[in-house]
Regions:
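Active-site beta-loop-alpha junctions of metal-dependent nucleic acid enzymes
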Residues: 102-125, 130
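C-terminal domain-tail junction helix/linker
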Residues: 204-209, 216-219, 225-285
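Short, positively charged, Gly/Tyr-enriched micro-motifs
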Residues: 1-64, 70-77, 96-98, 110
Length: 285
């Protein structure tokens, strides 16, 4: 935040208001600042995401349970959902509530691969990782493309491809298929073959994305672009991603979660104590 003459207190208050649900123009009116200044502060603060993510990935984790889900909003105009640029992918660690991925764009392979590539980096530093998704099979399929290995058993023929050891993926199949003829899908399913030495210690009642759903509801309250009762949701995809980057930093490193009473990065063991806006704006170099 070098070369800025604005007091840190004003910048932090404005950014905090943005992450508590105040709209962009409303924040400018309340704090008597220009739209150019607020946009610049959000861009600069959001750039800390890359630095903090790199720092988080340098740590080693014994076990993680990650939930995946999607969130939808409109961008610029009202278009069919499949054409919207406002789809947001979330990957959140269940126990600590640490967000590993929070990216928006069109719901296509590029957006999914961006989130799964980040998850593959997390896998490299985690001894045992479980991924739960609520009805979206592409998470497991894309992860299989990046994190698979050939299972050599000594038998003739091509080795079978399986997920790497200690990686578990479960999908909760949505909807009832009792009215459809043919073979019925199981309620809980592994979309791809897993390593035979992977410990299968997942019970059925743990296969859910409830924490991700709760976060989605919270994000609709704390990010004005996701509210359902507004006429215009977000002007540009880049602007929507800018607000998500700011929210990612505040959620993971500044704001205490109301259930754990600790900052998610502190709860996951990345930092010893939660940070403040002053710490991030003044001391990170």
């Amino acid at each position: 935040m070098e070369n800025l003459r604005t007091p840190f207190s004003l910048i932090s208050n404005a950014l905090l208001a943005r992450t508590e649900g105040l709209g962009f123009n409303a924040t400018c009116r309340v704090y008597n600042i220009t739209t150019r200044s607020l946009r610049s502060w959000e861009k600069r603060f959001g750039k800390l995401k890359g630095l903090l993510m790199t720092y988080a990935l340098t740590h080693s984790f014994i076990k993680q349970v990650v939930e995946g889900d999607e969130l939808y909003t409109k961008v610029r105009s009202n278009v069919p959902q499949e054409d919207s640029q406002g789809w947001t992918i979330l990957l959140i660690e269940r126990a600590s509530r640490f967000i590993w991925a929070l990216d928006c764009g069109k719901k296509d392979e590029e957006l999914f691969m961006k989130a799964i590539k980040r998850l593959s980096e997390v896998i490299q530093s985690t001894s045992d990782l479980s991924l739960f998704t609520d009805g979206e099979r592409r998470y497991g399929n894309k992860l299989f493309q990046l994190c698979h290995e050939s299972l050599k058993t000594g038998k003739p023929g091509r080795p079978k491809k399986v997920l790497k050891k200690d990686i578990k993926v479960r999908v909760k199949n949505k909807g009832s298929q009792s009215h459809k003829p043919g073979r019925k899908r199981p309620k809980y399913q592994a979309p791809q073959s897993e390593h035979p030495l992977t410990k299968q210690d997942i019970s059925d009642h743990n296969i859910n994305a409830n924490h991700a759903e709760a976060f989605n509801a919270s994000l609709r309250r704390r990010n004005s672009a996701y509210r359902r009762k507004t006429n215009t949701y977000a002007k540009l995809t880049e602007a929507l991603q800018r607000t998500l980057d700011v929210y990612w930093v505040v959620h993971n490193f500044i704001r205490q979660h109301y259930t754990t009473k600790r900052v998610p990065a502190e709860n996951l063991g990345i930092i010893e104590k939660g940070l403040s806006f002053f710490d991030l704006l003044n001391r990170v170099r």
